[in-house]
């Protein structure tokens, strides 16, 4: 049972970091765009990801874990990719150029990385059904956010 919980906690830790990357990325993007409607959507997605973090951390605690800045070795590569896209190299360049389309493009890329992280989590054997339900719902919400960002980008 302990090994199963360790696996659950490791998956949750990876997803917490993914959601935190998304939250930070959307906050940065929202602060950089001028269009009020686009800014509002990006702020909404930042809040959504903050909610994901809370839900995932709460779930980790239910399984006896803590999500204090921990990722697995498997998750490290996905987190590095997510961090690069979600924020911190490409998004900074787009923000510096004050190019809303480029900023939204980086948000799309960050969500693609998040979707991959969630898909990876869903492929983990032996996760409890209730956790799979949470992961699937959050993944669907990320997919919907990505589609919204794509639509916003196309209207600019």
Question: Could you tell me what each predicted segment is?
Answer:
Residues 2-34, 101-126:
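Alpha-helical bundle segments that constitute or directly flank the non-heme di-iron/ferroxidase center
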Residues 7-15, 36-55, 76, 100-106, ...:
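Alpha-helical scaffold segments that form or flank carboxylate-/histidine-based iron centers
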Residues 15, 22, 29, 52, ...:
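Amphipathic alpha-helices that form helix-helix packing interfaces
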Residues 26-33, 60-63, 67, 95-98, ...:
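Secondary-structure edge/capping motif, primarily at the C-terminal ends of alpha-helices
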Residues 42, 50-51, 55-57, 62, ...:
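Outer-membrane beta-barrel domain signature
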Residues 54, 58-109, 113-115:
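Carboxylate-rich helix-loop segments that flank metal/cofactor sites and access channels
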Residues 103-156:
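Preference for long, well-ordered alpha-helical segments
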């Amino acid at each position: 049972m302990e090994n199963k919980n360790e696996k659950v906690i490791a998956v949750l830790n990876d997803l917490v970091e993914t959601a935190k990357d998304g939250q930070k990325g959307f906050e940065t993007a929202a602060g950089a765009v001028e269009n009020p409607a686009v800014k509002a959507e990006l702020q909404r997605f930042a809040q959504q990801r903050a909610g994901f973090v809370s839900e995932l951390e709460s779930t980790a605690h239910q399984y006896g874990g803590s999500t204090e800045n921990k990722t697995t070795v498997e998750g490290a590569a996905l987190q590095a990719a997510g961090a690069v896209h979600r924020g911190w190299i490409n998004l900074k360049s787009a923000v510096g150029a004050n190019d809303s389309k480029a900023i939204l493009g980086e948000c799309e890329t960050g969500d693609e990385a998040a979707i991959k992280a969630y898909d990876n989590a869903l492929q983990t054997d032996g996760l409890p059904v209730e956790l799979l339900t949470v992961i699937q719902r959050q993944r669907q919400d990320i997919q919907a956010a990505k589609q919204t960002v794509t639509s916003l980008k196309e209207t600019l």
